Amino acid sequence: TMIDKIVPRPDAEIARQLAERGIEGMEILPRARGAAVAPFVNAEETQYLCIEDHYTNGRPPLELGGVLYCDRETVDKIEKMKVCTCLNPLHTAMSIYGCMLGYTLISAEMADEDLRAFIQKIGYIEAMPVVVDPGVLNPYEFIGAVINRRLPNPFMPDAPQRIATDTSQKLAIRFGETIKAYEARGLDKSNLILIPLVLAGYARYLKGIDDNGQAFEPSTDPLLAELQAIV
């Protein structure tokens, strides 16, 4: 199964806007370990759910609600398209540089022309030549929705600090697979300019100093202390 729908924790600004509209009882309630619950959910409009069609005695008609039924190989291809090319690499690139530039919202980063161009070029120019095409979803339509609808959405208050969590565990799959695909297909790796810049940016991020020379706290990561000792 592959599901793709970002649902951040309840946001105080969304609660305020709901209250302004006369909707009562929308208070956010803190929970253990920094979690929170609320009667509302701030989530994306765009959503994907792909399920392996491997039922023993019929299956519910979830396709009527937009669910994609496909074989296991296709589910894997959809996951690779998303994780290696069309969404997750862009997310990680934005999170690293967003933290260093003082952003706290992904949607605000998308208003920065340089950052927007940065992820567009990573996706369209460097990663798409080796994208895994699952057939049932168009990679260009998928990444177009990411850049033009999902990331700029101000009502989906996702933060670069959240996305930057465990970055050391994500770099290999989100960028290494593209580099390996270039090697396997005999493509010119010198065309990869911005993906190496993401990796260099991560080394800079690990220092915990933002673009104004002020200290910031990197997001939690199992290798944080080890990597900070190296850089």
Model-predicted segments: where are they?
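Substrate/ligand-engaging "lid" and interaction regions
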Residues: 1-231
